[in-house]
UniProtKB/Swiss-Prot annotation:
Protein name: Tyrosine-protein phosphatase non-receptor type 5
Region span, Disordered: 1-80, 169-189
PTM sites of type Phosphothreonine: 255
Compositionally biased residues, Basic and acidic residues: 1-16
EC numbers for this chain: 3.1.3.48
Biased composition (Pro residues): 56-75
Described function: May regulate the activity of several effector molecules involved in synaptic plasticity and neuronal cell survival, including MAPKs, Src family kinases and NMDA receptors.
PROSITE patterns found in the cross-reference section: TYR_PHOSPHATASE_1, TYR_PHOSPHATASE_2, TYR_PHOSPHATASE_PTP
Organism lineage string: Eukaryota, Metazoa, Chordata, Craniata, Vertebrata
Protein family membership: Belongs to the protein-tyrosine phosphatase family. Non-receptor class subfamily.
Transmembrane keyword on record: yes
Catalytic residues (positions): 496
Organism: Homo sapiens
Membrane disposition: Multi-pass membrane protein
Phosphoprotein is among the record's keywords: yes
């Protein structure tokens, strides 16, 4: 019975811990009031995960399963089981038995009750004798003296026992099994702020793009309307934890199978709220509001953490061998907007897969950009297949080949190379202060096309730039190159390492620059939500979000100076 009670109590503790962990994550999604700004330690678009895993000690091997027939020891085993009350009762009983024994052996056994008064009087008289030598001289070491000695010794022993029990620390709670623990990891970052000016900046604005952590999954259910309510299909939907103390809701904007006729999709209130936020969030900024907001890191931080990340649950892609085509296992293309390669084998879904999404442009124009991950060795051929298939005229690369570890494979040739029948030739390389421009020709059969490859090299390792003009200059160069392609330019491919952080900054800046020129206002919040609908995690960190605001603030000042007075 005691074992069953202890086990029930441990299960209750485990349930409380699980609910507490979920509550911590839920509560950490939104930051209504923040006492201090934040600097998030981040690695570019999730590339630091491998380094952090390398530095962390390996987890201890799992303990062998215990014999189910062997019951665990009861709670409190091996520790003191005596309480204060039991000690006092023991003391009283021992003194009573001691008194009875002494009286019995001293001849008072038959009439001890009759001589109780005399015994007490003898004890009081004995206590009044202050001269201990008088006891020895007078020979009064009789029954009362022995009784007093035994009482004193017993009192000292029992008092010592009680004092020891009172000082004994309470028994620690029984540790829960590892599988019953739910921990809400909270990492509170710090923040360093500096103004983004064309002049030299004194303090760097640190930005390490966040490591992509494995999502923690809630459960939502897909259920047929006419089916038995007891037969439910449980489907995992992801919650991606942002680096820092904030958990961003991950919602799948197009779950495969949800739109099939005869099936209903039951969304959780949190997911429904996140979907509604991405579709409706907006904050139009006039020029003065833009400048003020760019200088308010607290407001930008709070606004950024309100935006759902919209990452994809890896379980959405049940394609064997898919891991070989993803640079990061948790950064996947959203299904509804992903690029599908033409494949000679329609029964092989892996041959048509590439980690890339179509991204809408200014005014919701479809397929203006393609956001993709930095190619890896096993996807270089797929990357060039996509370039040829989409008639891409421009590629923008915003990462170095290595930043602590490999961020992108050098997928272009020194002179010439061929992939799947497409001949790639580098015609010319132009070096500028902030980027390198390669003029490339693509040829397949008798068809030949031109391609411009911009490699932006001014983005510092492991942080955001401390100056906005280089990125603005690149955006303007790419816009002019796209205008030369005509009114119906094919999608512009933009990539970094994971294809969400720096890539999101570039595309958001390009869209907002067009909006600022056309409307005189800018809505960076709405633009960010639009990007995350198409590809989860775009503009990955708070620092990148602030950087986009500073770039747009600088661009608005440039436009106001260029406008006729």
């Amino acid at each position: 019975m005691n074992y069953e009670g202890a086990r029930s109590e441990r299960e209750n503790h485990a349930a409380d811990d699980s609910e507490g962990g979920a509550l911590d994550m839920c509560c950490s999604e939104r930051l209504p009031g923040l006492p201090q700004p934040i600097v998030m330690e981040a690695l570019d678009e999730a590339e630091g995960l491998q380094d952090s895993q390398r530095e962390m000690p390996p987890p201890p091997p799992p303990s062998p399963p215990s014999d189910p027939a062997q019951k665990p020891p009861p709670r409190g085993a091996g520790s003191h089981s005596l309480t204060v009350r039991s000690s006092l009762c023991l003391f009283a009983a021992s003194q009573f038995l001691l008194a009875c024994g002494v009286l019995w052996f001293s001849g008072y056994g038959h009439i001890w009750s009759q001589n109780a008064t005399n015994l007490v009087s003898s004890l009081l008289t004995l206590l009044k004798q202050l001269e201990p030598t008088a006891w020895l001289d007078s020979g009064t070491w009789g029954v009362p003296s022995l009784l007093l000695v035994f009482l004193s010794v017993g009192l000292v022993l029992v008092t010592t026992l009680v004092w020891h029990l009172l000082r004994t620390p309470p028994e620690p709670p029984t540790p829960l099994p590892p599988e019953d623990r739910r921990q809400s990891v909270s990492r509170q970052p710090s923040f360093t702020y500096s103004e983004w000016m064309e002049e030299k900046i004194e303090d760097d604005f640190l930005d390490l793009d966040p490591v992509p952590e494995t999502p923690v999954f809630d459960c939502v259910m897909d259920i047929k309307p006419e089916a038995d309510p007891t037969s439910l299909t449980v489907k995992s939907m992801g919650l991606q934890e942002r680096r820092g103390s904030n958990v961003s809701l991950t919602l799948d904007m197009c779950t495969p199978g949800c739109n099939e006729e005869g099936f209903g999709y039951l969304m959780s209130p949190r997911e429904e709220s996140a979907r509604e936020y991405l579709l409706s969030a907006s904050r139009v900024l006039q020029a003065e509001e833009l400048h003020e907001k760019a200088l308010d890191p607290f407001l930008l931080q709070a606004e950024f953490f309100e935006i759902p990340m919209n990452f994809v649950d890896p379980k959405e892609y049940d394609i064997p061998g898919l891991v070989r085509k993803n640079r990061y296992k948790t950064i996947l293309p959203n299904p509804h907007s992903r690029v599908c390669l033409t494949s000679p084998d329609p029964d092989d879904p892996l041959s048509s897969y590439i980690n890339a999404n179509y991204i809408r442009g200014y005014g919701g124009e479809e397929k203006v950009y393609i956001a993709t991950q930095g190619p890896i060795v096993s996807t270089v051929a797929d990357f060039w297949r996509m370039v040829w298939q989409e008639h891409t005229p421009i590629i923008v690369m915003i990462t170095n080949i290595e930043e602590m570890n490999e961020k992108c494979t050098e997928y272009w040739p020194e002179e010439q190379v061929a992939y799947d029948g497409v001949e790639i030739t580098v015609q010319k390389v132009i070096h500028t202060e902030d980027y390198r421009l390669r003029l490339i020709s693509l040829k397949s059969g008798t068809e030949e096309r031109g391609l411009k490859h911009y490699w932006f090299t001014s983005w510092p390792d492991q942080k955001t730039p401390d100056r906005a003009p280089p990125l603005l200059h690149l955006v303007r160069e790419v816009e002019e190159a796209a205008q030369q392609e005509g009114p119906h330019c094919a999608p512009i491919i933009v990539h970094c390492s994971a294809g969400i952080g720096r890539t999101g900054c570039f595309i958001a800046t390009s869209i907002c620059c067009q909006q600022l020129r056309q409307e005189g206002v800018v809505d960076i919040l709405k633009t960010t939500c639009q990007l995350r609908q198409d590809r989860g995690g775009m503009i990955q960190t708070c620092e990148q979000y602030q950087f986009v605001h500073h770039v747009m603030s600088l661009y608005e000042k440039q436009l106001s100076h260029q406008s006729p007075e």
